[in-house]
Swiss-Prot record:
Name of the encoding gene: ligA
Source organism of this protein record: Desulfitobacterium hafniense (strain Y51)
Keyword Kinase included in the entry's annotation: no
Positions annotated to bind Zn(2+): C402, C405, C420, C425
Pfam families: BRCT, DNA_ligase_aden, DNA_ligase_OB, DNA_ligase_ZBD, HHH_2, HHH_5, Nlig-Ia
Biological role: DNA ligase that catalyzes the formation of phosphodiester linkages between 5'-phosphoryl and 3'-hydroxyl groups in double-stranded DNA using NAD as a coenzyme and as the energy source for the reaction. It is essential for DNA replication and repair of damaged DNA.
Name of this chain's protein: DNA ligase
This enzyme's EC code(s): 6.5.1.2
């Protein structure tokens, strides 16, 4: 039926053109009623003639796919975070560092949308994968949900062999207010702010729910342009618009850092004038060649920085000061406040850090205080308002006994922290488990603090290693679980056994050992057994491992309780070696590019194999490329490889290299 297929294709073109005009150019050409009529006709025709339905049809934006879980996906290149600037001095220092390497520089300044980073992959012009940022290296695939966002094109307007795009998913203020109103009427808990609502919406297993949330997306970065080299960030933004993406129009170009600083000051006053939340500005070196010259640190690009708006300050009252015992035994005083709305959410508590901080600020129970969110995230007390004191305020004293276990509290010389002396303190054990299961550690989804409290109270666990001995029949009766949740939890626990050495080291909660240090130690020693034998002297020789960390690591592994805990993990089958150590590193130190349409495997699988065997799956061809794996319809990357004299392998030739 050529007439039906032609009508379907015409409808798709009309709808996608309308999406581009509305979201890409901000120039709507159809009324809502006209748009809805076209979409409903398309849905009806595709339902009557399913043989013409395609994955990139705009009808797929209404949702309908229900996922069982979100599979993990490794990003083509790591999604690094940005260094932060909080004032003019920080921006001047950033400019000094840049100009030390490049003399003439132009900056482009973009709005920092308060949402969540989303990575998109297009192959042969079609959207094939979308993922969350995750830990920067591995995220969750949420393609079906992202297809429901009209600002994300399902097919590029210009053909491209491969295109990796990064941008920010967000919820407009209007959508957020409507959603919370609906939830309030339904008796459901409200979202604290649009960012949380967007994050929750993108992680819905039912894509129809995501479609109803009316999310937005602004694209800002391209990793693999196929139309030659893009010379500047502004050229990248223009290219993205040409390809059908929604690009935030509020960007400016400046040639002097003083102009950037002045613009930042202007935007502090205008930050609330937009239909979406912004929490700062992103300043980038505009020239792409200069970006490459400046390069990256381990955590962030040297050519970009995020200017964070000054924190909004609000007055409230300290109703009480309560002690919380952490996983390392530190007693942290927390101010319980009269709830107030600040920087996008209601705040009822704020950390006071330690007794020295309380004394320095002279915070007392009953005080009127100004609070803010440090970095717009963590609530803190800025200062007291002494003129509002009545004389009834009470001075806080640090307890001499742990409020959780009544063990003595000590303060070691040279430290600001007070600590519980008992390693069996229930609060320390509870917080240690919460840390162990956290996303950047063992990443056991569905095991939040409330469930952990239940497991402890029911006597089902005493430490994190006991999680691996949990059984279905013991979980189902618990209040917050049930059959399906118990199944999902046990699967998440089982999956965590394969997390590898670096997350496990971080999850152990060793004092001074953060996520980065966990990766360094895993790379250095390769197995938990070798790390357990490490001495202070050899640990101190490792770059980025100082004396305090070395001493802490050595002492941790000397404890009998540590050996007992690790043995329980071993018996449960938890992997205690670096993930890469299981396979020969035949591609170690090699940068490899995959391009074109493959027949035997999909491209992402080949890139994963390259990394598992020690190589780097690069997104562009350069002189440093070891070789290119080329499938059918390989485009500009193949041409560039031939131009540079870089070896080109077929899919079969690549397969022969594998052990």
């Amino acid at each position: 039926m050529p007439d039906v297929s032609q009508r379907i294709e015409a409808l798709r073109e009309q709808i996608e053109e309308a999406n581009y005009q509305y979201y890409g150019l901000d120039q709507p050409t159809l009324s809502d009623a006209e748009y809805d009529a076209l979409l409903q006709e398309l849905i009806r025709l595709e339902k009557e003639h399913p043989e013409f339905l395609t994955p990139d049809s705009p009808s797929q934006r209404v949702g309908g796919y229900i996922a069982k879980e979100f599979p993990k996906v490794r990003h083509a290149e790591a999604l690094l975070s940005l260094d932060n600037a909080f004032d003019a001095g920080d921006l001047l220092e950033f400019d000094r560092r840049v100009r030390a390497l490049v003399a003439e520089v132009e900056y482009v300044v973009e709005l920092k949308i308060d949402g969540l980073t989303v990575a998109l992959t297009y192959e042969d012009g079609a959207l094939v994968r979308g993922a969350t940022r995750g830990d920067g290296e591995v995220g969750e695939e949420i393609t079906a949900n992202l297809k429901t966002i009209p600002a994300i094109p399902l097919r590029l307007r210009k053909q491209a062999d491969r295109l990796d795009v990064r941008g920010e998913g967000y919820m407009p203020k209007g959508s957020f207010l409507r959603l919370n109103q609906e939830r309030e009427e339904a008796g459901q808990p409200l979202f604290a702010n649009p960012r949380n609502a967007a994050a929750g919406s993108l992680r819905q297993l039912d894509s129809r729910i995501t479609a109803q949330r009316k999310l937005g997306y602004f694209a800002y970065q391209v990793l693999t342009p196929e139309e030659g080299e893009l010379a500047s960030q502004t050229a990248v933004l223009d290219y993205l618009k040409e390809q059908g993406f929604s690009v935030n129009p509020e960007y400016r170009v400046f040639s002097a850092i003083e102009e950037v600083i002045a613009y930042c000051g202007e935007m502090v006053e205008k930050r609330h004038n937009y239909p979406y939340d912004i929490d700062g500005l992103v300043i980038k070196v505009n020239d792409i060649a200069q970006q490459r010259e400046l390069g990256f640190t381990a955590k962030s690009p040297r050519w970009a920085i995020a200017y964070k708006f000054p924190a909004e300050q609000v007055e409230t009252v300290v109703e009480d000061i309560v002690i919380r015992v952490g996983r390392t035994g530190v007693l942290t005083p927390t101010a319980y406040l009269t709830p107030v709305f600040v920087a996008g959410s209601t705040v009822g508590r704020a950390t006071l850090h330690n007794l020295d901080n309380i004394r320095a600020k002279d915070v007392r129970i009953g005080d009127h205080v100004l609070i803010q969110k440090a970095g717009d995230v963590i609530p803190e007390v800025v200062k007291i308002l002494p003129e509002k004191r009545t004389g009834g305020e009470r001075i806080f004293e640090m307890p001499e006994l742990c409020p959780e276990c009544q063990s003595p509290v000590i303060r070691e010389e040279g430290e600001a922290a007070h600590r519980c002396t008992s390693i069996t303190c229930p609060a320390r054990q509870r917080e240690a488990i919460i840390h162990f299961v956290s996303r950047n550690a063992m990443n056991i989804d569905g095991l939040g603090p409330a469930v952990i409290y239940q497991l402890l109270e029911a006597g089902l666990i005493k430490d994190a290693a006991d999680l691996y001995a949990l059984e279905y029949d013991a979980l189902v009766p618990l209040e917050r679980l049930g059959k399906k949740s118990a199944e999902n939890l046990l699967k998440a626990i089982e999956d965590s056994k394969e997390r590898g050495l670096a997350p496990l080291i971080f999850g152990l909660g060793i004092r001074h050992v953060g996520e980065k240090a966990g990766k360094i130690l895993a790379q250095k020693y390769g197995t938990m057994e070798d790390l357990e034998k490490a001495q202070v002297e050899e640990l101190q020789e490792i770059p980025d491992v100082g004396p305090a960390m070395a001493q802490s690591v050595a002492q941790f592994f000397q404890q009998e309780s540590t050996h007992h805990f690790l043995n329980k993990l071993r018996q449960a089958g938890v992997v205690m070696s670096a993930q890469h150590s299981a396979k020969p590193q035949i591609f170690a130190g090699k940068s490899i590019v995959v391009t074109g349409s493959l027949q035997r495997w999909d491209r992402h699988y080949v890139e994963t194999m390259i990394e598992e065997f020690g190589g780097k799956a690069a997104s562009s061809v350069s002189k440093k490329t070891a070789f290119v794996v080329a499938g059918e319809k390989a485009g500009s990357k193949l041409a560039k490889a031939k131009e540079l004299g870089i070896p080109v392998l077929s899919e079969e030739e690549f397969a022969e290299l594998l052990p």
